[in-house]
């Protein structure tokens, strides 16, 4: 189990516990449950890379303690 930090740059930071083999879409559902946002509106980025919903966190090399940028569409 890993813990990933999501920051929306508007003052909201969320720590989410998940498995490395979870897809980004599953991870968005966990983030949405904590923030009260629709998971379809959440866009996760690291630098300028936008993460696709069907790829796993391990494939994107997201590890324990890593921070992701969260945007709303």
From Swiss-Prot:
Keyword Kinase: no
A GO CC annotation given for this chain: cytoplasm
Domain Ubiquitin-like: start-end pairs: 1-73
A GO biological-process term: protein modification process
Major localization class: nucleus
UniProt keywords, alphabetically: Cytoplasm, mRNA processing, mRNA splicing, Nucleus, Ubl conjugation pathway
Domain of life: Eukaryota
Function, in words: Forms a conjugate with snu66 and facilitates its localization to the nucleus. Involved in morphogenesis. Required for efficient splicing of pre-mRNA.
Protein's name according to its UniProt entry: Ubiquitin-like modifier hub1
Species name: Schizosaccharomyces pombe (strain 972 / ATCC 24843) (Fission yeast)
